[in-house]
Amino acid sequence: MTSSLPSKPIHTIELAPATRLIRVTEVMAIVGLARPTIYKLMSQPESGFPQAVKLTDSTARGAPVAWVLSEVLDWTHARIAARDRVAA
């Protein structure tokens, strides 16, 4: 009988940036912004900052959310590209 379980323990499986969810502390470390600034950017569509993904069906304030790593990295790269266009 074959098993459909992964051959590695789940904590050692690496996820692609497009599927990996990260919590706000990791977002803060990547973009160098404070939590309130991140949420402010999310409320401003023109900022282009990625929206969080709800991790539960809860509508309560403080319900768990996460961001898609690739979207955060794309936003960061876009900020760098914007800087480079201005400098050129």
Regions found by a protein language model. Name each.
Residues 30-65:
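Major-groove DNA-recognition helix of helix-turn-helix-type DNA-binding domains
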